[in-house]
């Protein structure tokens, strides 16, 4: 659950390395294409045509791949080099045209308008890009803007334009030189500060920026420039350089793999034993798989939000201990039976109920179970902010919320009735207790002063009961109406008197 769009992404210090991986894949392939261009660009006939057209053809193919994957496999389209190649190749083509004196601004006026239009495109891409349709078509804005931006600051032979003054000064050039180091260091520094002292205040943000600059400058001068200076002074054969590089890669891979394999033993955190506290899928311990199997012919369809996955280890145990076959469908914000609001009218969730019911109707047998698993209450905290308890309590009882709960109850009642006609039982968990602070972020000496931990963990049980009452009452009404509905009160177990 540490993917690029996971809620936990801001706490993963390695999250940004995937884009570096895509970039390095490009640099493995691109030199071959570029070498053909260098050798054959002055040729006539087939060789000259190949030299000038191979990169544009590959770029067009990549752009189409980006379009197709965006429709059919959006995750692949976002992560893989075939669908991202065109963004990097665009800069290569611009350089090729510049060597032929093409597209170069002929006046300061042309350079200036390209600068500001390019800058506007980049800002528009940052502000309006839809991640559901990225890189195609929304990356076109930022790529086009970057091309115009670069084009505006090349040497025009027209004296010192505003573009040259802005972006060819010593500070801008130096920032460009250390830009790789800036990208490499900024994310782990920000992630570690989020884990420890926090990154909420202006002072903390300035500290993060300062540390990023210091680490970037140090790695640039000692590593990037240092290696270049050392290589120029030492007479090392190309074979030795390649062999040394491969050795470093192998050792780094082995060391990193070993580090991750043993991270639970190396961790300084009290939360290192994720089997105890982290509910996501773990191998079940101490289970005699031949002990029961009393539900060997039964199936359970778990349909919900992220809490459907939070039950993974428990469901795995049920499968091994009782023999029940478990199918887990986590639908995020479109979870069925969430009870806080109707789903069918929620933007982006239209048709979700019908799709899931079709799956159940095709697979389920009489006596099977559908488990609607959701949180079903408001949070007092999320990954990024604290919520005022009194405002949250008021929200749980205001007229708009009560109306949404009523419509959600009607919607869920229809689903339960349809399942009853199939002979399928329904299990719904009552709202669970919520904390004032996330334990996995506030349990260690190095993060207890984090602003996210300032309220501590304790919450009055009466407050939680009061906040959950509208949803609980609505579920109890459903329970009285439908004989095939079972309510699971885990609140009383997790928060006893």
Per-region residue spans from a language model:
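Membrane-interface helix/loop caps of multi-pass membrane proteins
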Residues: 1-233, 248-251
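Extracellular/periplasmic envelope-modification machinery, especially enzymes
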Residues: 130, 196-203, 213-214, 221, ...
């Amino acid at each position: 659950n540490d993917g690029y769009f996971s809620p936990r992404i801001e706490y993963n210090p390695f999250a940004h390395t995937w884009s570096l991986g895509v970039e390095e894949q490009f640099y493995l392939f691109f030199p071959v294409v570029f070498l053909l261009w260098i050798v054959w660009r002055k040729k006539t006939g087939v060789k000259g045509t190949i030299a000038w057209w191979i990169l544009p053809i590959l770029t067009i193919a990549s752009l189409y791949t980006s379009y197709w994957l965006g429709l059919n496999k959006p995750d692949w389209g976002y992560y893989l080099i075939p669908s991202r190649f065109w963004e990097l190749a665009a800069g290569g083509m611009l350089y090729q045209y510049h060597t032929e004196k093409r597209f170069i601004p002929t006046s300061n006026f042309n350079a200036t308008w390209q600068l500001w239009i390019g800058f506007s495109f980049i800002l528009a891409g940052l502000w309006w890009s839809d991640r559901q349709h990225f890189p195609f078509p929304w990356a076109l804005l930022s790529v086009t803007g970057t091309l115009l931006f670069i084009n505006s600051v090349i040497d025009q032979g027209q004296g010192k334009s505003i573009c040259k003054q802005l972006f060819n000064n010593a500070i801008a050039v130096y920032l460009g030189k250390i830009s790789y180091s800036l990208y490499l260091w900024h994310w782990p520094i920000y992630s570690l500060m989020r884990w420890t002292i926090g990154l909420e205040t202006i002072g903390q943000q300035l500290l993060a920026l300062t540390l990023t600059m210091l680490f970037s400058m140090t790695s640039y001068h000692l590593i990037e420039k240092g290696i270049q200076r050392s290589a120029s002074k030492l007479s090392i054969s190309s074979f030795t350089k390649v062999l040394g590089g491969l050795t470093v890669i192998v050792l780094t891979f082995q060391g990193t793999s070993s580090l991750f394999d043993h991270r639970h033993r190396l961790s300084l955190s009290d939360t290192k034993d994720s089997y105890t506290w982290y509910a996501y899928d773990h191998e079940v311990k101490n289970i005699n798989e031949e002990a029961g199997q009393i539900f060997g012919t039964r199936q359970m369809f778990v349909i919900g939000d992220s809490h459907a996955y939070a039950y993974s280890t428990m469901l795995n145990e049920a499968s091994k201990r009782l023999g029940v076959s478990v199918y887990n469908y986590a639908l995020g914000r479109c979870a069925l039976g969430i009870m806080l609001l109707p789903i069918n009218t929620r933007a982006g969730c239209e048709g979700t109920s019908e799709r899931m019911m079709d799956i159940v109707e095709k697979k389920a047998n009489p006596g099977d179970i559908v488990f609607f698993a959701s949180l079903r209450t408001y949070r007092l905290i999320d990954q990024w902010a604290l919520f005022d308890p009194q405002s949250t309590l008021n929200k749980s009882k205001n007229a708009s919320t009560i109306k949404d709960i009523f419509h959600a109850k009607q919607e869920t009642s229809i689903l339960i009735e349809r399942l009853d006609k199939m002979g399928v039982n329904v299990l719904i968990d009552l709202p669970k207790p919520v904390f004032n602070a996330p334990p996995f972020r506030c349990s260690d000496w190095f993060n207890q002063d984090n602003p996210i931990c300032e309220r501590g963990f304790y919450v009055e049980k009466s407050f939680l009961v009061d906040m959950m009452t509208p949803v609980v009452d609505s579920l109890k009404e459903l329970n009285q109406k439908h004989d095939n509905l079972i309510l699971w009160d885990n609140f009383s177990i997790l928060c006893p008197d």
